[in-house]
A protein has these predicted regions:
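Flexible loop/turn segments at secondary-structure boundaries
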Residues: 70-71, 91-93, 116-117, 176-180, ...
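Short, glycine/charge-rich flexible loops or terminal/linker lids adjacent to PRPP-binding catalytic cores
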Residues: 188-234
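Generic beta-strand/beta-sheet core signal
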Residues: 56, 64-65, 76, 85, ...
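Secondary-structure transition/capping motifs at alpha-helix termini
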Residues: 12, 163-167, 185-192, 226-230, ...
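Short, well-ordered alpha-helical packing segments
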Residues: 2-6, 27, 44, 184, ...
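Conserved short alpha-helical segments that host acidic/polar catalytic motifs at enzyme active sites
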Residues: 1-104, 109-166, 172
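PRPP/pyrophosphate-binding module of the type I phosphoribosyltransferase fold
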Residues: 216-262
Length: 262
């Protein structure tokens, strides 16, 4: 796309980490349309993958969700104002209520006094399932489904069906905790916090480019509690299956710290 735009005498003025700024590239694709709708549709056609966007204009905010609906956008409303965000968890403390979820490929213009649909949503959706399982903040809702509720109910059903004999259930923080709490209730066993997360300075363990750094992050940010592990038959709920980095290392650490069964 960069080469294509340069061949059309387009000009890039911004760099991000030594590479063409992706926001500027998308902006140039939008300018190729006769209006915002045609320009955004051009983005939908040219970008391989997902691209949802918010455009701040003189006449309000234009909200556009990617054509497959993989990444969410929710519109909030309060008296005299509208807001758009990818995470509904950002709305309550600002006084907004969820008004609606933007559909796949849908384009909406927001003004303080109302909203205008500029492009209707298309049929079919390929929403990212990781939103509920891994990425999502517990109080966020996507497509009307609350993140923590989905995790809790998944664990609850698993706890009802699982026949493993365990002394307690634990969750790998953060997003494994909701499922572990549900499992504990469904199984009728106590929930123990046998492993804690130290979050400052450490990113998600699957994002670094090399395996050495991924392993270091996975090791350093999760700290086991020997007192809660010693001699216990533990069931851990862990959502981190992107690369399996934490799963492999954590099981070994739990045994090293005295767990009887994991």
């Amino acid at each position: 796309l960069e080469a294509e735009l340069l061949s059309q005498n387009m000009h890039f003025s911004e760099l991000s980490s030594g590479k063409t700024n992706q926001t500027e590239l998308v902006a140039l694709l939008i300018t190729q349309g006769k209006d915002f709708v045609e320009g955004i549709e051009n983005v939908y056609q040219k970008i391989k993958g997902s691209c949802s966007m918010l455009l701040l204009t003189e006449d309000g905010i234009i909200v556009a969700r990617d054509k497959w609906g993989r990444t969410p956008i929710v519109i909030g409303k309060k008296e005299g104002a509208y807001a758009a965000t990818s995470e509904s968890s950002s709305l309550p403390n600002l006084g907004y209520e969820i008004e609606r979820y933007v559909g796949p490929g849908e384009i909406i213009r927001l003004r303080a006094d109302g909203m205008e649909q500029m492009r209707a949503p298309q049929e079919g959706m390929q929403v990212c399932s990781f939103l509920w399982v891994y990425y999502g903040f517990p109080v966020s809702c996507y497509e009307g489904k609350n993140v923590e509720e989905v995790r809790f109910l998944s664990g609850f059903k698993m706890g009802q069906k699982d026949e493993s004999e365990v002394d307690c259930v634990c969750g790998i923080p953060d997003s494994g905790v909701g499922m572990a709490l549900g499992y504990a209730e469904g199984k009728g066993v106590p929930y123990h916090r046998a492993i804690a997360k130290y979050t400052p300075t450490w990113p998600r363990s699957f994002t670094p480019a090399n395996q050495e750094m991924r392993s270091l992050v996975a090791k350093m940010k999760l700290i086991p509690n020997r007192a809660m592990l010693q001699g216990k038959r533990l069931l851990f709920c862990d959502d981190s299956i992107v690369r399996g980095t934490q799963l492999r290392d954590n099981v070994k650490i739990l045994y090293d710290y005295g767990a009887k069964e994991v």
